[in-house]
Amino acid sequence: MAQYECSEHMENFLRELPKCEHHVHLEGTLEPSLLFKLAKRNNITLPETFPKTVEECNDRYNRFADLQDFLDHYYIGMGVLITENDFYDLAMDYFTKAHSDGCLHSEVFFDPQGHVERNIDIDVVVQGFNRACKDANTKYGTTNKLIMCLLRHLPAENGLQTIHSASKYYQDGIIHGLGLDSSEKPFPPNLFTECYAHIKDNFPEVGLTAHAGEEGDHTFVSDALNLLKVSRIDHGVNSHQSEELMQRLAEQKTLLSLCPLSNVKLQVVKDVKELPIDKFFQMNVPFSINSDDPAYFGGYILDNYKAVHTRFGFTKDQWKIIALNGIKGSWCDDQRKNELISLVEEVYKKYNIEGC
């Protein structure tokens, strides 16, 4: 993979700049070291073809052929997560790393169907992740929210059953959003209209988002907006194929949760510079920069910020706008948004006073 480096001053600015992460899969933060630790702890035998060491894992993760190749490894890794403490440890490791990168608000995905089909109760999953959210909030002064994703390669009926089984967590405000992930092209948004309608009708305060326009074309984005009634699009890089869609995203202030290093790792593009990030900026399409599955793609949120800066050379003024758009597009309350906005202003002022 290409190297992305920037000046020490700019890296410090980007590190301190308060960030919101809207697109990270907790199962995708499973570092090889924790994967092997949990496999041993839970007496899990990994497939014979799976890498045997941390080094071999990292090497294999550097050679994903496409989205499906990654997903095959992703689901194997998921298999070592068994107990509530496993899910807690996984999430706390992520929150600790994200905080060190200057991430103050996270809205994190998890895939309950991938665990339930392994006979792991959804309560084990949610309670482990929720406990980590609470502990991270207390320890780091951050805010963290859970978004339950449906796996689009599974039948929509299964997704609806999963929503019903998670209803109490939506009711209690423990799960804050609904998302849609996994293989995109064979499973378009129209398959999941009933799932999204159920959430919208029964829990209107819950945020709706969906992966769209990563491998699928711009019509996947339009369909997610029109049919699923989402207020956010995950990835959405192919939105640039339609000027009409771009104008709509800008006018409606629909946030795209971009994942630059993920797009390179999964062969969507060869280099971050090929992404239409500058076009999104020029056309006032709001976006945030995110890590997606950092344990598999070799970069957490700061790494993605650095990669974008290296390739597009955004000024501190432009980075301030990106940070503010991320805050405004978050599903936290106005008080928290105002706190984060003030912190962005403080960091921006600090680095401008330094005169660089």
Curated annotation (Swiss-Prot):
The lineage of its organism: Eukaryota, Fungi, Dikarya, Ascomycota, Saccharomycotina. It is an enzyme of class 3 (hydrolase). GO terms for biological process: adenine catabolic process; hypoxanthine salvage; nucleotide metabolic process; purine ribonucleoside monophosphate biosynthetic process. Its main location: cytoplasm. The record marks H235 as: Important for catalytic activity. The gene is AAH1. NCBIfam families: aden_deam. Transmembrane segments: none annotated. HAMAP family: Adenine_deaminase (MF_01962). Catalyzes the hydrolytic deamination of adenine to hypoxanthine. Plays an important role in the purine salvage pathway and in nitrogen catabolism. Its cofactor is Zn(2+). It comes from Candida albicans (strain SC5314 / ATCC MYA-2876). Substrate binds at D293. It catalyses: adenine + H2O + H(+) = hypoxanthine + NH4(+). It is found in: Cytoplasm; Nucleus. This is Adenine deaminase.
